[in-house]
Amino acid sequence: MGITGLIPFVGKASSQLHLKDIRGSTVAVDTYCWLHKGVFGCAEKLARGEDTDVYIQYCLKYVNMLLSYDIKPILVFDGQHLPAKALTEKRRRDSRKQSKERAAELLRLGRIEEARSHMRRCVDVTHDMALRLIRECRSRNVDCIVAPYEADAQMAWLNRADVAQYIITEDSDLTLFGAKNIIFKLDLNGSGLLVEAEKLHLAMGCTEEKYHFDKFRRMCILSGCDYLDSLPGIGLAKACKFILKTEQEDMRIALKKIPSYLNMRNLEVDDDYIENFMKAEATFRHMFIYNPLERRMQRLCALEDYETDERYCSNAGTLLEDSEQALHLALGNLNPFSMKRLDSWTPEKAWPTPKNVKRSKHKSIWQTNFQSENTHTPKKENPCALFFKKVDFVGKTLNEEIEANQRLEQAKQTEAELFNMYSFKAKRRRSPSREDSVDQERTPPPSPVHKSRHNPFAKERTGEEANQRSPVVCENASLLRLLSPKKASPLDGEAGVKKVDSLKRSIFAKEQVQIRSRFFATQDEQTRLQREHLRDTENDDMDEQKLSSHSGHKKLRLVCKDIPGKNPIRQRCSSQISDGETDTDTTASSLLESQDKGVPSPLESQEDLNNSQPQIPTEGNTNSTTIRIKSLDLLLENSPEPTQESDRNNNDAIILLSDDSCSSDQRASSTSSSSQQRQNFLPTSKRRVGLSKPSTAKKGTPKSRTNGKLGAVSQNQTKLSMFGFQTKPVLK
């Protein structure tokens, strides 16, 4: 029954299917397959001639299962035997007769188990058994149709006419009739194997462009079918190889080349085989079926479609001229073999439905107003991670769903916004142009804690918070950032000061961030406390000496005219310059104390002291000027004679490098005079700060040190040129 090995051969074109995947569709069922399975369970009773309905209940299980999945079944039964299958049917009858005789003999011998196997083989499904099932289906409003000849051709037409979207069968011959979707091996769990005609080229191993269904049909006929036996040694594999190799459309010429193409020299292909091959192909194409929509018999495919000679259609059946007889045959009221009338049921009559029986609610194909709804069920697809919501375009809430979808789409971010959020953009750091004119308007520098800076944890500050002094921030371990007064806030707090040096990694705006070295955090505090204690002790001793020796003289203080305001710590440092403390030590310690204690630095507190100091009369100013001149003369007379080394120190002043070149002119003018005055009476021995080492040169033999970039360096100067100090001429 069918083509041997065809279902495994088409494995690449098949897939697993469950009935829930085709919910709401219509299926055509080869009912004789169910009847043969049902008869297998009650073969002993049927062989003995006992009455049973086991096979009926077996078929109804499948019917109820289909109805539970909202699937409309159309049960199709076989009709008359074709002349082409006369030989096949004769062999089947002989086999059943032999099995029946063997079963009776085994029962007489008492070998019951062996007799049962033969009894199953000898049982045949008759039309009377099929009629009992048809009556049960009528009570459930399930359509049944009896084909004029083969049920395979009838089901293929229903599938191609889109009356049924799927076909359920166990006969592999159905694929040769051109069915689109066939379900094999359906069980009571609802699982089956779906074979799709559009994927058959995968089973043949050719591309879709070179594939045609006629090639598949011819391959199956060559391998052997119900209408034609195969040639010796020819199966599906060799038949497929030959069909793919030949390009001849006329099979009468191509079949003669089989021995040479398949390298089978002993194989003979006679004219009788070629004639039977053409008849078998015409039978699969042009078999008669019954059209329930038009209530008439017709061919599966018209002869004009393939330009087939009618003489090859002798095995495809004959047309019944009486349309009324053809209708009752299709309804199951006639015996297809004897044409004896068995029932008089018509679709217009209502069939009584027993209680507790599930009735189908689908429209019958026998109704005159029946039309194919063309409701295609979507095919089973691979599971997808995305969830697609089904939109009902016929419902009343169509506009609401569209508006909701539009709101969701508008709320989503655009592609450009997403790229802007997740893409890394390296920003260029551009050095501002050097402008000679100071009066030209400059845009204020951006905030140093802007999001684009390298510090991702900094927070933006408002206008009020920006005016306040920010706490000390340890940015790196550079000694230059610790000792350079240029890193403090600008002198006058001017807005619009532009940073020029592009080599620095971070640019800080005025009064926003102070830089403090982490390296000298602990050592600087200890050094500052020691120096403060020494200065206090020396200050007390010197006060006692001055009170005893110079009781008549007034205590004089050096006041830098360019820097009128100083904090108390800076005043104490400047008053004790002559006691051995260097200007560099005093400046560094004062800066450190101002940063640690939160006291403004001397340069920063200049503007505040100028505003807070009361106005002194002109006469007082003259007296103070005279006192300063006299005190300077006394100090110059008491000071030792300067050496060549000290002269060079007097002519030079320590200038600190900074990133802020715009404010360097103002700072240099404010500190040049005071630096020059302090350098005039600096002692030869100086205290070293930071990483500097004491000089190893012998006393009395001064040796000038040179620097490749900064030139000659004074011996008395600290070794801080590596951190940004250099010697420059004092601005006059």
Curated annotation (Swiss-Prot):
Cofactor: Mg(2+)
Residues annotated with Phosphoserine modification: 431, 433, 447
Binding site for Mg(2+) 2: 171, 173, 226
InterPro entries reported for this sequence: 5-3_exonuclease_C_sf, EXO1_H3TH, HhH2, PIN-like_dom_sf, PIN-like_EXO1, XPG-I_dom, XPG/Rad2, XPG_CS
Region (I-domain): 138-230
Compositionally biased intervals (Low complexity): 661-677
Region (N-domain): 1-99
SMART domains recorded: HhH2 (SM00279), XPGI (SM00484), XPGN (SM00485)
E.C. no: 3.1.-.-
Annotated GO CC locations: nucleus
Any Pfam family: XPG_N
Entry binding sites for Mg(2+) 1: 30, 78, 150, 152
SUPFAM superfamilies membership: 5' to 3' exonuclease, C-terminal subdomain, PIN domain-like
Ranges where the record places region Disordered: 422-471, 524-625, 661-716
Cited Gene3D superfamilies: 5' to 3' exonuclease, C-terminal subdomain, 5'-nuclease
Family annotation (CDD domains): H3TH_EXO1, PIN_EXO1
Annotated positions of the Phosphothreonine modification: 443
Subcellular location: Nucleus
Biased composition (Basic and acidic residues): 432-442, 457-467, 525-537
Cofactor binding notes: Binds 2 magnesium ions per subunit. They probably participate in the reaction catalyzed by the enzyme. May bind an additional third magnesium ion after substrate binding.
Protein name as it appears in the record: Exonuclease 1
